[in-house]
């Protein structure tokens, strides 16, 4: 009987498809990482060989996916408890944990070594540090130990523009640090809004998110605080001259709207009103970051096209 059960388990694990492995890469998170990395690469001064640019973005994507896989390997116990994650490949019994670990480590090594050999070792070092920071510092330490987990751990998601910039220029500049800071400051209000309407899930998994440790009021206050700091930082690319007036105007409007949504969440009276405001802030935060970086990308592409064709 035990032998048959073991055979059934092995059969279930062997039926993992390419789609199941794709889920391990956290494709939705990866898409935002790849996009911000691409923006950093394109906005950086100069022109990069298209093939090397494609290799750089591929390595950022693979590295981001590797981080996601390592996160799912370590967090399998948490994922099994939370409603939104219990159907992931490990808790669902589709892929064995050791296979996920091997998959994540292989992708990590491939992305870092390929980026170093084909592009430059500065960008590879930044990618390696990003993977380490997310998989070890955030996932294995911060996430389960402090309500400031996503404040410090948010650095991992903020590195891709710096990686793209370093791939294109071989340097880390203050301009690339500004792109890092935009995402770094965006992360707390984004995830705290999520944690407010997912508090029960996090509590069941014993993850010390801000609402469960410090309370909803403190979470709302800190989300507003970070939003107020983030809004002017989002305008800095225009102030520093590596973005144009269109970006300056749009980033100002988006920043003011972000602060407004955070303020609405702060002043919400009833529980239903607060939860509705948290969902609106969460959704708008995605629009804010993608919109900001999309305008940066379009402006940079237009400017470089004008220069290339002698129109500027």
Curated annotation (Swiss-Prot):
Matching CDD domains: PT_UbiA_Cox10
Residue intervals passing through the bilayer: 29-49, 50-70, 90-110, 117-137, 150-170, 177-197, 223-243, 248-268, 292-312
Superkingdom: Bacteria
Reactions catalysed, as given in the entry: heme b + (2E,6E)-farnesyl diphosphate + H2O = Fe(II)-heme o + diphosphate
GO biological process: heme O biosynthetic process
UniProt pathway: Porphyrin-containing compound metabolism; heme O biosynthesis; heme O from protoheme: step 1/1
Keywords, in A-Z order: Cell inner membrane, Cell membrane, Heme biosynthesis, Membrane, Transferase, Transmembrane, Transmembrane helix
Gene3D superfamilies (UniProt xref): UbiA prenyltransferase
Keyword Lipid biosynthesis among record annotations: no
InterPro entries with a match to the protein in the record: Protohaem_IX_farnesylTrfase (IPR006369), UbiA_prenyltransferase (IPR000537), UbiA_prenylTrfase_CS (IPR030470), UbiA_sf (IPR044878)
Topology class, membrane: Multi-pass membrane protein
Primary role: Converts heme B (protoheme IX) to heme O by substitution of the vinyl group on carbon 2 of heme B porphyrin ring with a hydroxyethyl farnesyl side group.
Miscellaneous comment text of the record: Carbon 2 of the heme B porphyrin ring is defined according to the Fischer nomenclature.
Name of the protein described by the UniProt record: Protoheme IX farnesyltransferase
UniProt source species: Brucella anthropi (strain ATCC 49188 / DSM 6882 / CCUG 24695 / JCM 21032 / LMG 3331 / NBRC 15819 / NCTC 12168 / Alc 37)
